[in-house]
Amino acid sequence: MKIAILSDIHSNIFALEAVIAHFKRKSVDMVVNLGDILYGPIAPQATYERLRALEDEFNVVTIRGNQDRQIYEADEAELESNPTMAFIHEDLTSDAMDWMRALPFDRQLTDYLYLCHGTPDNDLIYLLEDVSS
């Protein structure tokens, strides 16, 4: 089974379209989206709509990232102090917000494939490698 893995789209519809074209050429069987989908100043609603349309073409599994959660948890103070967040809230429909809220934190896809954004316990912790010679 060929699985295309997406992550950290950050509302970049243009990059998303290029990636979709690539994995269509590769004849993938499934698309896995690891979150951080709509936070960004480019095109949150258009990105949401494209991803939902992708579900008509492929078996798509999506989990939420930390910034997806931060979008629907944003309060008035955050919207006033963060122009990007304010733009996202203005751009997204209630359907898009509801979709994000419903995304799971993680998913056990198979016996050997576990999906999460960050670590299994915390979506704010980054897995970083310290590579030395």
Listing of model-derived features with the role each one plays in the protein:
Residues 2-97:
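Core catalytic region of metal-dependent phosphoesterases/phosphodiesterases
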